[in-house]
Amino acid sequence: MYSAKKILGLIGRNVGYSYSPYIHNTAAEKLGLGYYYTIFNISSHDLVPSALEGAKALGIAGFNVTIPYKKTVVACMDKLSPEAEAIGAVNTIVNDNGTLIGYNTDIAGIVIPLEPYASMIDAQPVGIFGNGGAAMAAIEALSTCFTPSGIRLFVRQREKGSELCRQFKDKNLPIPLSTHTLDDHTAQHNCRLLINATPIGTKGLDTAPAGSIIPSGSGVVHSGQIIFDMVYNPVETQLLQLAKATGAIAIPGIEMLIGQASRSFEIWTGKAMPVTTVRNKLQELLLTEKRSS
């Protein structure tokens, strides 16, 4: 008798580059679980509600959500976890018999790679590039799990950054939050930690510019910094290359990807992701891709 697998997937726009299917299918296969993870490309924000209604009808078990829909899906949820409600962004959805529950595991994906550097971050300014759902998760992670002296938000349009700052200040954020423009290189240089929470530098994403969020000749990056790039394809982005060239600590987006994926996997399946197996298999895949490119 045929036993249907439970379907999981990634909601996003032009996300064929994602390693999430490989990660989750590797984990499910290792544990012998009846899940299959795929990609659901949605072309525009206005199609998201009907897509999620269709998912309810089809009995799709759950989703990850990526750029640009982490905020869009919030209004479609029947319930929100405390962390998703706190930041107004969802990256993980559970379909519980037609009830959609939104979570945010990006926070875990940010905290886990940064934990070894907590003492470096303590009482020092930190910076985040971006004003979307990933940036919101970074603000929440840094303000609740670490003790920086302040969080600087670097954005292209200052009014959007100011709006985000107001949103967090209304929640009595325990750490000062300020808005700066992308060309404020002095403020960036003085940050102990810089996080790229934008898609800039992503390979194969038509909507994101190539290159680095920090220009190589800007003098921003130095050996006393931690550079965390949420972009994971390519594994070594131009920003991470710049970090390594200047002696800064470089944290690749793959670490965040695995961190948030492991938490999502546990929410869906009730099982701990076999992280060592997943990391080893992913590294093998990346090495193969690098050789063939």
From Swiss-Prot:
For biological process, the GO terms are: amino acid biosynthetic process; aromatic amino acid family biosynthetic process; chorismate biosynthetic process; shikimate metabolic process
Enzyme Commission number(s) of this protein: 1.1.1.25
Against InterPro entries, the record matches this protein to: Aminoacid_DH-like_N_sf, NAD(P)-bd_dom_sf, SDH_C, Shikimate_DH, Shikimate_DH-bd_N, Shikimate_DH_fam
Species per Swiss-Prot/TrEMBL record: Chlorobium phaeobacteroides (strain BS1)
Pfam families for the chain: SDH_C, Shikimate_dh_N
Q: What does the record give as its pathway?
A: Metabolic intermediate biosynthesis; chorismate biosynthesis; chorismate from D-erythrose 4-phosphate and phosphoenolpyruvate: step 4/7
Q: Which domain of life is it from?
A: Bacteria
Catalysed reaction(s) here are: shikimate + NADP(+) = 3-dehydroshikimate + NADPH + H(+)
Q: Which residues bind shikimate?
A: 18-20, 66, 91, 106, 232
Q: Which NCBIfam families match?
A: aroE (TIGR00507)
Indicate what this protein is called per its UniProt record: Shikimate dehydrogenase (NADP(+))
Record-level Gene Ontology MF annotations: NADP binding; shikimate 3-dehydrogenase (NADP+) activity
Locate the residues binding NADP(+): 130-134, 230, 253
Q: Which gene encodes it?
A: aroE
For the keyword NADP, the answer is yes
Recorded hits in CDD domains, A to Z, give: NAD_bind_Shikimate_DH
UniProt subunit comment: Homodimer.
Keyword entries, A-Z: Amino-acid biosynthesis, Aromatic amino acid biosynthesis, NADP, Oxidoreductase
Family indicated by similarity: Belongs to the shikimate dehydrogenase family.
What does this protein's UniProt record list under function? Involved in the biosynthesis of the chorismate, which leads to the biosynthesis of aromatic amino acids. Catalyzes the reversible NADPH linked reduction of 3-dehydroshikimate (DHSA) to yield shikimate (SA).
UniProt signal peptide: none
The active site consists of 70 (proton acceptor)
